[in-house]
C-alpha cells in the first residue's frame, strides 16, 4: 500500500484535488544578475566580472498612484500612473579593482566628474539589467533560467561605497541604486509571464471586481 500522507502537507482548498501537494518554491540563493552595456566598453568580460561579484539584489517593486473619484455620499478609486521603484544591487569589491573600474566607467558615462561635463542624451549611458532565477544546475549540468526580470532604460541613481571598519570580518562592498524605465517578466522558455504577458483588454465600459458571490 503506497504512503500518500505527503499529499496532505498542503493547504486545503475548495473543489476537487483540494489536498494536492505543495509546489516546489523558487530559492532565493539560486540567481544571477547581468548588466548589459554597463560601463564604457559594455564588453562581456566586464559584465561577467560584475555578475560574479554580486552579493544580493532586490527585485522590481511596482506601485500605482491612487486616483480618487468623488461621488454622491461616497467615493471610488482608480489605478493611476504606475511607478517602478529603484532596485538595489550590492557588489563585493575585488583586490584588482575590476568591479570599481566598471562601476566608475558607468558613472563617468552619466557625468564626467573630471571635466564636469554631462552626457548629450540618456541613450549614451543607459543600460539593461537581467535578474534571473536559476534551477540549481552548474558545470556539466548547465543552469536553466526559470524566471527573469528584464529591466530597460537603466542608470545608476546612487552609488554607496559603504563602510570600512577594524572590527569586522566582511569584504568591502559597493551598493548601487538602479533606476529604470520599464520591466518585463519572462518564464523558462522566454515566454512572457506575469508582467508583460498578453491579456485580453476590454474596449467596452463594464463593471469589474464589484460583484460578491457566495
Predicted regions and their residues:
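Glycine-rich, low-complexity intrinsically disordered segments
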Residues: 1-214
Amino acid at each position: 500500500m503506497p504512503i500518500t500522507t505527503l499529499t496532505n502537507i498542503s493547504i486545503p482548498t475548495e473543489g476537487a484535488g483540494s489536498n494536492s501537494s505543495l509546489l516546489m518554491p523558487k530559492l532565493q540563493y539560486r540567481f544571477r544578475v547581468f548588466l548589459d552595456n554597463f560601463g564604457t566598453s559594455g564588453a562581456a568580460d566586464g559584465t561577467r566580472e560584475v555578475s560574479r561579484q554580486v552579493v544580493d539584489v532586490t527585485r522590481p517593486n511596482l506601485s500605482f498612484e491612487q486616483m480618487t473619484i468623488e461621488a454622491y455620499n461616497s467615493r471610488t478609486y482608480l489605478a493611476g500612473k504606475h511607478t517602478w521603484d529603484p532596485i538595489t544591487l550590492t557588489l563585493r569589491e575585488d583586490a584588482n579593482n575590476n568591479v570599481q573600474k566598471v562601476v566608475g566607467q558607468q558613472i563617468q558615462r552619466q557625468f564626467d566628474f573630471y571635466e564636469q561635463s554631462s552626457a548629450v542624451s540618456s541613450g549614451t549611458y543607459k543600460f539593461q539589467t537581467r535578474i534571473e532565477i536559476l534551477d540549481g544546475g552548474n558545470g556539466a549540468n548547465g543552469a536553466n533560467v526559470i524566471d527573469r526580470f528584464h529591466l530597460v532604460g537603466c542608470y545608476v541613481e546612487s552609488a554607496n561605497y559603504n563602510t570600512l571598519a577594524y572590527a569586522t570580518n566582511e569584504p568591502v562592498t559597493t551598493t548601487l541604486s538602479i533606476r529604470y524605465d520599464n520591466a518585463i517578466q519572462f518564464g523558462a522558455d522566454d515566454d512572457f509571464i506575469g508582467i508583460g504577458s498578453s491579456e485580453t483588454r476590454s474596449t467596452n465600459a463594464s463593471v469589474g471586481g464589484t460583484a460578491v458571490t457566495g
